[in-house]
Amino acid sequence: MNKMNGTNDEKHFNHFVIALSFIYGLTELGYLLLKDFITIAISLPL
């Protein structure tokens, strides 16, 4: 029973890490896209 609980916690932790890295990847990508968009928006009037 105790061992089963441990694996459940481990699974939970793995899901948390995956979700965290996924969110981090999305924000990183969003930041890069935003930076490109701002750069383009600034260069357009010039």
From Swiss-Prot:
Transmembrane segments: 12-34
GO cellular component, one term: plasma membrane
Keywords: Cell membrane, Membrane, Transmembrane, Transmembrane helix
Membrane topology (UniProt): Single-pass membrane protein
Location in the cell: Cell membrane
Name of the featured protein: Uncharacterized membrane protein YrzT
